[in-house]
């Protein structure tokens, strides 16, 4: 049986509590120990996984757009295939970045160049495919693979446990509860979430998330809104 090596490149752990990191970690958990025998068109094969290895693999999956990975691309592509994850586009992070106009445009140009340099792209959002195509990227080399979470970590609990969990967080155990998880950013819909909460005071609304990337402005708007 043939063996190949999959090298996973990521610096998502540089900032804790954000979606790219959790998506990367969940993917690692999903594939770990499950690639020993893969059925291919030309026979079975095995994928050995390495993480942030300096030696490039037959397949190198780049999860974050760090310049150090971009500079390695010629060597990566000379040995194998470069696969890039598309977690965001210029228009989806525009409200989250607080950069001068020139720096902002330079980053956006770099981001699209990064994506264009990949042999294959994987996006977590199917709506990104036509948008990437509008940037001049061949949609045939883009695959949609949604994010996923571990069923053993996120699972249903019985009614008594629900009450206990709510009480432990200072919530009314009996009220209808709405929960949203995400970074505290305008693009995540936190202001709309707050507006709905004000309109439905009979329910309790909980937002689980931090402001790792420029969320302070959003927080200021949220505080202003709640005072009105």
Regions found by a protein language model. Give the residues of each.
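N-terminal subdomain of nucleotide-sugar transferases
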Residues: 1-49, 198
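Short donor-sugar binding/catalytic loops of nucleotide-sugar-dependent glycosyltransferases
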Residues: 12-14, 181-185, 211-213
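Active-site proximal beta-strand in glycosyltransferases
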Residues: 58-64, 75-95, 122, 145
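Membrane-proximal helix-turn-helix segments that form the acceptor-binding/catalytic region
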Residues: 102-121
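Carbohydrate-associated surface elements
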Residues: 127, 148
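A short helix/loop element that forms part of the nucleotide-sugar donor recognition site in Leloir-type
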Residues: 155-171
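Conserved donor-binding/catalytic core segment of Leloir-type glycosyltransferases
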Residues: 166, 172-188, 194-200, 206
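Short, structured helix-loop element that forms part of the nucleotide-activated donor/catalytic region
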Residues: 204-228
């Amino acid at each position: 049986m043939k063996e190949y090596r999959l090298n996973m490149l990521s610096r998502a752990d540089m900032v804790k509590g954000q979606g790219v990191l959790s998506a990367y970690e969940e993917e690692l958990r999903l594939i770990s120990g499950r690639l020993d025998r893969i059925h291919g068109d030309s026979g079975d094969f095995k994928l050995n996984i390495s993480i942030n290895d300096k030696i490039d693999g037959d397949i190198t999956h780049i999860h974050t757009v760090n310049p150090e990975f971009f500079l390695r691309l010629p060597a990566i592509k000379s040995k194998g295939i470069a696969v890039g994850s598309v977690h965001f586009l210029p228009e989806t992070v525009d409200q989250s970045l607080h950069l001068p106009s020139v720096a902002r445009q330079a980053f956006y140009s770099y981001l699209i160049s990064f994506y264009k340099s990949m042999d294959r792209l994987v996006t977590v959002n199917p709506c990104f495919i036509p948008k990437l195509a509008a940037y001049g990227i061949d949609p045939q080399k883009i695959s949609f693979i949604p994010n996923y979470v571990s069923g053993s970590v996120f699972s249903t609990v019985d009614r008594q446990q629900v009450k206990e969990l709510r009480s432990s967080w200072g919530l009314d155990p009996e009220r209808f509860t709405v929960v949203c998880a995400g970074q505290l950013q305008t693009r995540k819909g936190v202001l709309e979430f707050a507006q709905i909460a004000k309109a439905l005071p009979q329910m309790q609304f909980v937002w689980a998330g931090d402001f790792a990337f420029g969320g302070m402005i959003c927080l200021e708007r949220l505080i202003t809104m709640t005072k009105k």
